[in-house]
Amino acid sequence: MKAAVIVFPGSNCDRDCKVAIERSAGARVEMVWHQETALPDDLDLIVLPGGFSYGDYLRCGAMAAQSPVMKEVVSAAGKGVAVVGICNGFQVLTEVGLLPGALLRNAGLKYVCKPVELDIVNGQTRFTAGYGEQRQAVMTVGNGEGNYFADEETLDRLEGEGQVVFRYKENPNGSARDIAGIVNKGGNVLGLMPHPDRAFDADLGSEDGAVLFRSIFQSA
């Protein structure tokens, strides 16, 4: 089992993701700098971590989406490799076109950092199958631009095709239809604002993030 964590200038959750994956799933994790033009071979998972890539200049995730390594990430996603974008990583996935919609400033115009309760809307994805009968999860958000937006037609399609994976029980940022995480149509690309990398050990207040990481490798 093998994963890669992409590191951009300004990433600050890359090491969190590495430790979370190693401890949750026992996978080998390689850190990949944004200027690389090739990914490690035989990857089961690629993670775009949280943080403030390129200082959030221009627009959150916009500059990271133009990094050389992202061409390889898009190519790997097209071949079915699992890709997870967490927080800033979710923003990058929308900027590069792997997921629809955009992440806007929080409705309250403030940075929000706190544990949130999530409904597991679709438990049949490769990211959520490990939750079994569990229908709620607790993870932590930490963002100023976590307000998911898409037009009504796109939102209807996401809901109708089972692409909404996580939904906030109490919306912290104004996200359309309380959406916290979505997958692409192929089911192998997940973007979510809550941090599974901050919920992989009981000492952190929740182990629900560990379930997500294990699910990925169990389905690989």
Curated annotation (Swiss-Prot):
Localization per record: Cytoplasm
Pfam hit, one: GATase_5
UniProt pathway annotation: Purine metabolism; IMP biosynthesis via de novo pathway; 5-amino-1-(5-phospho-D-ribosyl)imidazole from N(2)-formyl-N(1)-(5-phospho-D-ribosyl)glycinamide: step 1/2
UniProt-listed GO biological process terms: 'de novo' IMP biosynthetic process
GO MF entries: ATP binding; glutaminase activity; phosphoribosylformylglycinamidine synthase activity
Active-site annotation: 87, 195
Protein EC: 6.3.5.3, 3.5.1.2
Domain Glutamine amidotransferase type-1: start-end pairs: 3-220
UniProt KW Cytoplasm keyword: yes
Keyword terms, alphabetized: ATP-binding, Cytoplasm, Glutamine amidotransferase, Hydrolase, Ligase, Nucleotide-binding, Purine biosynthesis
SUPFAM superfamilies documented for this protein: Class I glutamine amidotransferase-like
GO cellular component: cytoplasm
Gene3D superfamilies recorded: 3.40.50.880
Keyword Transcription regulation: no
Reactions this protein catalyses: N(2)-formyl-N(1)-(5-phospho-beta-D-ribosyl)glycinamide + L-glutamine + ATP + H2O = 2-formamido-N(1)-(5-O-phospho-beta-D-ribosyl)acetamidine + L-glutamate + ADP + phosphate + H(+); L-glutamine + H2O = L-glutamate + NH4(+)
Annotated PROSITE patterns: GATASE_TYPE_1
Function: Part of the phosphoribosylformylglycinamidine synthase complex involved in the purines biosynthetic pathway. Catalyzes the ATP-dependent conversion of formylglycinamide ribonucleotide (FGAR) and glutamine to yield formylglycinamidine ribonucleotide (FGAM) and glutamate. The FGAM synthase complex is composed of three subunits. PurQ produces an ammonia molecule by converting glutamine to glutamate. PurL transfers the ammonia molecule to FGAR to form FGAM in an ATP-dependent manner.
Subunit structure as annotated in this protein's UniProt entry: Part of the FGAM synthase complex composed of 1 PurL, 1 PurQ and 2 PurS subunits.
Protein name, per record: Phosphoribosylformylglycinamidine synthase subunit PurQ
Species of origin: Caulobacter vibrioides (strain ATCC 19089 / CIP 103742 / CB 15) (Caulobacter crescentus)
Record lineage: Bacteria, Pseudomonadati, Pseudomonadota, Alphaproteobacteria, Caulobacterales
Gene (name only): purQ
